[in-house]
């Protein structure tokens, strides 16, 4: 068996497809289509394997619709069967090849990484910077305007072609071309597109670390931060990075991309990181997040009181937010929120 055949087997044989089904059902087993597939999981997986081996597999037409909250965006929804196949393709062929060579501080959508790891990494960067320069220093915070809606298909496919073997690239290209019309724009809900998202800027990551020599650099998808002692040098970096992005068809969000003093604090992944005069890093939850949560809790509790939603679901929602808030220095805030949440239920048996 050659390498290409081995890669294909790792994607289309029964066991990886079955494992993908178990992964895909999480959080959506309540849907009728998912429950039906899962209840007949062995039979459906054998059928899918047979179609993939014989070359008779054809993806079903995706359903496209718009959502408006928290912001308007297009959604592409695919059948559960197609999701199972794509999950196996992503996990067993695309991701292992694409992630080779990533810098350590590319933090999104990867095994062993994520938001918690990214926050801890930024905190460590600030502490290291403090040991050399105190609180003197500057931040270049970058944000790309409409990262996924403006991602050119040829740019993403070129990156896939550069790093994937021939069989995997052919399958990847087929999936993306069948799901997305036109030359520009992807739906970030797709795992395959998320892999494109962490990969397309890989060359830029290496450029910032190895050519611009920025030691304290971190990227979470299209949100990235550079820390340096020189404001002038960071402004130079901004110009050079902007030119690199333009080559790929991207542009900065000019309102969110700026150079500023480290003393102002860095807002990243839902928290503001404040470096104190003693070198301690404090994480403060964004006030907007707290305000939104209070409104949401009020709405959910009213629904529960009317019998439209079980209290356990509302408790689960609040505890999820609370666990997130607890990642910062939020002891007093959590006490206030616990009291607010308890007061919302007053009058209930």
Predicted regions and their residues:
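Right-hand nucleic-acid polymerase module
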Residues: 2, 78-79, 83, 87, ...
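Conserved pre-motif C helix in the palm subdomain of viral-like polymerases
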Residues: 72-103, 183-210
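Reverse-transcriptase-like RNA-dependent polymerase core
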Residues: 17, 48-71, 84, 167-179
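Non-catalytic, polymerase-adjacent accessory regions of viral genome-replication enzymes
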Residues: 1-46
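Conserved polymerase palm-domain catalytic core
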Residues: 51, 120-221, 225-244, 260
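Glycine-/proline-rich flexible loop or hinge segments
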Residues: 23-35, 65-76, 103-105
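Active-site-proximal segment of RNA-dependent polymerases
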Residues: 3-7, 90-152
């Amino acid at each position: 068996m050659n390498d290409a055949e081995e890669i294909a087997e790792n994607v289309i044989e029964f066991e990886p497809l079955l494992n993908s089904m178990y992964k895909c059902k999480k959080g959506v087993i309540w849907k009728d289509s998912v429950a039906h597939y899962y209840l007949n999981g062995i039979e459906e997986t054998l059928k899918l394997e047979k179609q993939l081996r014989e070359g008779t597999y054809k993806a079903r037409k995706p359903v496209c619709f718009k959502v408006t909250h928290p912001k308007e965006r297009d959604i592409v929804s695919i059948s559960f069967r197609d999701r199972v196949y794509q999950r196996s393709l992503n996990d067993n062929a695309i991701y292992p090849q694409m992630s080779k060579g990533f810098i350590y501080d590319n933090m999104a959508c990867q095994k062993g990484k994520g938001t918690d790891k990214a926050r801890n990494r930024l905190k460590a960067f600030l502490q290291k910077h403090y040991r050399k320069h105190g609180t003197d220093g500057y931040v270049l915070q970058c944000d790309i305007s409409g990262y996924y809606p403006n991602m050119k298909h040829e740019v993403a496919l070129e990156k896939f072609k550069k790093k994937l073997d021939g069989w995997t690239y052919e399958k990847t290209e087929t999936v993306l071309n069948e799901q997305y019309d036109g030359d520009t724009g992807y739906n970030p809900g797709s795992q395959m597109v998320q892999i494109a998202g962490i990969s397309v800027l890989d060359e830029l990551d290496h450029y910032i670390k190895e050519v611009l020599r920025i030691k304290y650099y971190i990227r979470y998808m299209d949100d990235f931060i550079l820390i340096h002692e020189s404001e002038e040098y960071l402004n130079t970096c901004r110009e050079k990075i902007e030119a690199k992005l333009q080559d790929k068809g991207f542009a900065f969000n000019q309102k969110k991309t700026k150079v500023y003093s480290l003393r102002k604090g860095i807002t990243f992944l839902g928290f503001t990181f404040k470096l104190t005069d003693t070198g301690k890093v404090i994480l403060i939850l964004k006030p907007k997040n707290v305000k939104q949560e209070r409104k949401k809790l009020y709405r959910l509790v009213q629904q529960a009181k009317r019998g439209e939603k079980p209290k356990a679901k509302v408790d689960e929602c609040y505890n999820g937010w609370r666990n997130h808030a607890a990642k910062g220095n939020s002891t007093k805030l959590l006490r206030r929120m616990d009291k607010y949440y308890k007061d919302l239920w007053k009058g209930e048996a």
